[in-house]
Amino acid sequence: MRIKIYLLTLALSTAANGFAQERLDIPQPCQMHEQATPTPTIALTRATADKHYVIPVVFHVFGTDFNGKHVTRELIEDALRRTNDDFNARTTGDLRSGDDDPQFDKLSTPLDIEFRLAEIGPNGEATTGIVFHRLESGFGVYNPPKMQKYAWDNKKYMNVYIMNDLYGDGVTNNSGVSWYPNWEMTRFKLARVVYNGAYLGSNTDENFRRVLTHEFGHFLNLAHTFDFDNTKFPDGCHKGFHGEANPGDYVDDTPPADRQQMGPNDVNCLGGKTNWTNYMNYSYVRTSMFTKGQVNRMLAALQDKSRSCLWSDATHAKVFLPDASHPRVVLESKQELFPKDVKGNYDVTVALRVIGASAKQGPLTAGTDFTVEGLPDGLTASATGDGQMIQLHVKGMVTLGADKKFFVTIQPSATTAPDCYVGRQPLTIACDYVESELATAIKRGVETADGSRVAWAGNGDVTVTAPRGARVAVHNVYGEALVVAHVADRALTLSLGGYGHGVYIVSVTSSCGTKSYKIVLVSAKNGNHIKILPRCQ
């Protein structure tokens, strides 16, 4: 079966109308959205290949639902192990590293590199290199303030953002997007790989999970091996935009390919075979190798200052422990703590895991076994230990106009290891009165708080369930009231399909007060979709 895909670039933004919205069940290989073409001269500064490169990585996981799949620490650890096997050409099985064609199998070359989860975070905290967050979307487009809010220093960490909706357009089957080396992006904490958790590791099949390898290849300055409709990334089969010869992917030993997904029996514009199993190709059948030329190109990219800062000894001393088995306490649950109601009542348990030791059994003593800094007035914290886990309990009531960060430090006395690594774990008191899980909201149409809820239908209808007599108003971003109505019998349905795509505010006022929901109406081929975005107002 031939599967159609589309490419999103700065010059041609087709995501909103692309094939992915026609067939939400088919995963899309790579919606590459690189902000710069690969640098041709970087290959001239290639270092020798006799070095083992270690790249510190942090995975930021946003939300819990990825097209019915889930992303756990164990899944990420396994996915990264497999990606390292791909780069080092040690993948085995039916889709082994290399190519069945001897012409290309002899070109299969390992890169001596390890993408390793960070062990020390930016605040000096011990970490698994995996941070779980509230649901977010759209990091595949240019949104500096939001990305910078979560990003760890790009000069020390390779940031991988795991989310379901990469472009914030309601499409949940785009697999991944990455950017070439760029110092300005690194300096401003915008260098990144954005990837869909639905296609991470064992959440998908063995071949398609290698799209992550493909995206990491882009991160190290590799372009696609194929020509995509003679647009921004030609590979040698066609002339450039002005009739000039084009350099293709800047790699001599990857033959030109007229199109993506060419197979073993397809010939290119020169009448020759293509390296169809290359990781930088699109294939739903097999991708399993980098060539020697591509490895040389990645070695050159590793000398660029936007990438060399990642593997320096100075960086490693700040992001890795001297001994990976050293006892430490890491955050296991989400970084954000959400209130249970609109009044700002908090009753939240934060899970911390002890690695290399055990927790002290029973209640822990504040000020001795653990300390808390910056907790808002009105909230209190207590902690208990049990086996490998420490549970931090935060209770109380507070009204916030914005998220508030605080820190907890688990002292060695809370564990069985006197030399347990001590670091300040950053946590956030979220001002959202419900946990914002957009993926769940989009699929099930539910956001609940204080007995009220807002739900949506694919035709643009919004249903508000609230106490009888509650006032419901819909405003545009300019504050103009479009609809004002009252709930007659616990439910009210409003039709917004005729207003067109854009941002609207739905306010529900009852005896419990007023809560505003920010919603985004997105025009799609199969009707108007509404995404509910309850945020701090």
Task: Cite the ranges covered by each PLM segment.
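Active-site-proximal segment of zinc-dependent metalloprotease catalytic domains
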Residues: F139-D227
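Bacterial Sec-dependent N-terminal signal peptides
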Residues: M1-P27, G527-Q537
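Extracellular/luminal low-complexity segments enriched in Ser/Thr/Pro
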Residues: M389-D403, S495
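The catalytic-center signature of Zn2+-dependent metalloproteases
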Residues: L200-M289
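Low-complexity "stalk/linker" and mucin-like segments enriched in Ser/Thr/Pro/Ala/Gly
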Residues: G367, T371-M389, L482-V484
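Propeptide-to-catalytic entry region of secreted or membrane-anchored zinc metalloproteases
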Residues: Q21-D153, T315-F320
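Pan-zinc metallopeptidase signature
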Residues: Y284-H326
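C-terminal outer-membrane/trafficking sorting elements
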Residues: A441-Q537
